[in-house]
């Protein structure tokens, strides 16, 4: 069994992600962090899923059993956990969330003492410890060496200050009307608060979590409500977060969703014009639209590509000395202000762009033409090795010969195959997509 996917440990709560597994994962991670411990403290936060209570208690049990002290801060965005872990000088931070997934799923994400997500090599070390029963048994403490846990409810203020510091001091949102969809998730308190404190008039949607309604027909993956509300209330902008508020989808004043690659291009160019972009370029992923390449080139900037996942984006950013990158899906990293994707930091930079340029979102956030692109997610029974699927090489070669860019990969968190095609000829692209879907349905679900 493999524990870690593309973004921590994730699965259905109570079946894969049981209390027992959560406790053991926490013990394994704690054993790893103990070897490098400075403060003997680990921070634990969560989103608004009902199963978060079960998993949080299991994690606290596992960590205190091996002698760690635990600080519990309740529902907070994933980027807040990264920030507060470093701010409170903890050895590590743990976020309990399945991000954009529905309430049935949950997950466990780890951050080191600097607020960075763990590299794959560290995750592999933790997996080894997880499966080593003797190491787990030997690490358990007794008597006065057992750790303690305490809950702190006022750390939200630290994160709000950090968010406000990311917004230019010479600007105010006092003339802005904003619709915010909090996805009934971890950003339901901090999102409205920071926008209102910066002066905006905020219409808030889906900010009443009940443990089951997180991401339920709302948030970054379900934008119907925010789009309609922007038009209804004549708002300047719509902001849709996902369940743990590490990604954002922006809606213009006409109620139309802004493409994620367009957003990256607009923000990257804005930072370059202001002289705040470092490294001479931006980082995106292998799934980004080729139109973004053309736009960056026209601006005299480089576009570096990483594998999918904001952790991989950040690794390339560090390697190339770049402070801005992101994914088409809405994960945007501005490393001057955040160690991971941060939906609220990103939204504040969009608002700064609109105020500095005095432009409407519909114009400012669509600076280039996108190539026609289509992404289809195919549910699969098993994840066969792609290189071993008969006839696939020939199919991909045919796409190459006909000018169709392609990316085929399995989801790291779900039983799905993602097929992305891109071509200047939309009709050709759609025809080939129909063929590819039929091919994979037979190859993987027969």
Curated annotation (Swiss-Prot):
Please provide an example of a Pfam family that matches this protein in its UniProt record: PGM_PMM_I
Modification note: Activated by phosphorylation.
Q: Which InterPro entries is this protein grouped with?
A: A-D-PHexomutase_a/b/a-I, A-D-PHexomutase_a/b/a-I/II/III, A-D-PHexomutase_a/b/a-II, A-D-PHexomutase_a/b/a-III, A-D-PHexomutase_C, A-D-PHexomutase_C_sf, Alpha-D-phosphohexomutase_SF, GlmM_bact
Q: Which residues carry this modification: Phosphoserine?
A: 99
Q: Which reaction does it catalyse?
A: alpha-D-glucosamine 1-phosphate = D-glucosamine 6-phosphate
Active-site residues annotated for this sequence: 99 (phosphoserine intermediate)
Record GO cellular component, one term: cytosol
Q: What class of enzyme is it?
A: isomerase
What CDD domains would the database entry show?
A: GlmM
Record keywords: Isomerase, Magnesium, Metal-binding, Phosphoprotein
- The answer on whether this UniProt entry bears the keyword Transmembrane helix reads no
One Gene Ontology BP term is:
peptidoglycan biosynthetic process
Question: Binding of Mg(2+): at which residues?
Answer: 99, 242, 244, 246
Q: Which SUPFAM superfamilies match?
A: Phosphoglucomutase, C-terminal domain, Phosphoglucomutase, first 3 domains
Q: What family does this belong to?
A: Belongs to the phosphohexose mutase family.
What name has this protein been given in UniProt?
Phosphoglucosamine mutase
Organism from which the protein derives: Sulfurimonas denitrificans (strain ATCC 33889 / DSM 1251)
């Amino acid at each position: 069994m493999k524990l870690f996917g593309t973004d921590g440990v994730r699965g259905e709560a109570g079946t894969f992600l049981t209390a027992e597994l959560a406790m053991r994962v926490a013990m394994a991670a704690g054993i790893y962090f103990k070897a490098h411990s400075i403060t003997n403290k680990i921070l634990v936060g969560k989103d608004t899923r009902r199963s978060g209570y079960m998993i949080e208690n299991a994690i606290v049990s596992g960590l205190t059993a091996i002698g760690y002290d635990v600080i519990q801060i309740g529902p907070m965005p994933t980027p807040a956990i990264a920030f507060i872990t470093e701010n409170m000088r903890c050895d590590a931070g743990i976020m309990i969330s399945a991000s954009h997934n529905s309430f049935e799923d949950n997950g466990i994400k780890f951050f080191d003492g600097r607020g960075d997500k763990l590299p794959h090599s560290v995750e592999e070390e933790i997996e080894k410890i997880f499966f080593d029963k003797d190491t787990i048994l030997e690490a358990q403490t007794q008597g006065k060496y057992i750790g303690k846990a305490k809950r702190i409810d006022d750390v939200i203020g630290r994160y709000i200050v950090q968010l406000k510091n990311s917004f230019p001091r010479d600007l105010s949102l006092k003339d802005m009307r904003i619709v915010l969809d909090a996805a009934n998730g971890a950003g339901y308190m901090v999102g409205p608060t920071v926008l209102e404190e910066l002066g905006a008039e905020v219409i808030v949607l889906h900010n009443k979590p009940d443990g089951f309604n997180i991401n339920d027909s709302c948030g970054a993956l379900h934008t119907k409500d925010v789009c309609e509300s922007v038009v209804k209330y004549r708002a300047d902008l719509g902001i849709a977060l996902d369940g743990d508020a590490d990604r954002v989808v922006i809606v213009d004043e006409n109620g139309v969703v802004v493409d994620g690659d367009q957003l990256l291009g607009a923000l990257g160019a804005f930072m370059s014009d202001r002289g705040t972009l470092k490294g001479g370029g931006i980082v995106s992923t292998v799934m980004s639209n080729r139109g973004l390449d053309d736009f960056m080139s026209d601006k005299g900037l480089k576009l570096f590509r990483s594998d999918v996942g904001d952790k991989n984006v950040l690794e390339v950013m560090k390697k190339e000395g770049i402070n801005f990158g992101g994914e088409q899906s809405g994960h945007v990293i501005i490393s001057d202000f955040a160690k991971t994707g941060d939906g609220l930091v990103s939204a504040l930079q969009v608002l700064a762009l609109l105020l500095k340029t005095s432009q409407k979102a519909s114009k400012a956030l669509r600076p280039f033409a996108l190539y026609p692109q289509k992404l289809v997610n195919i549910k699969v029974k098993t994840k066969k090795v792609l290189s071993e699927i008969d006839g696939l090489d020939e199919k991909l070669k045919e796409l190459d010969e006909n000018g169709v860019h392609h990316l085929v990969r399995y989801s790291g968190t779900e039983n799905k195959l993602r097929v992305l095609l891109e071509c200047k000829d939309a009709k050709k692209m759609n025809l080939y997509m129909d063929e590819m879907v039929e091919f994979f349905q037979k190859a993987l679900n027969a």
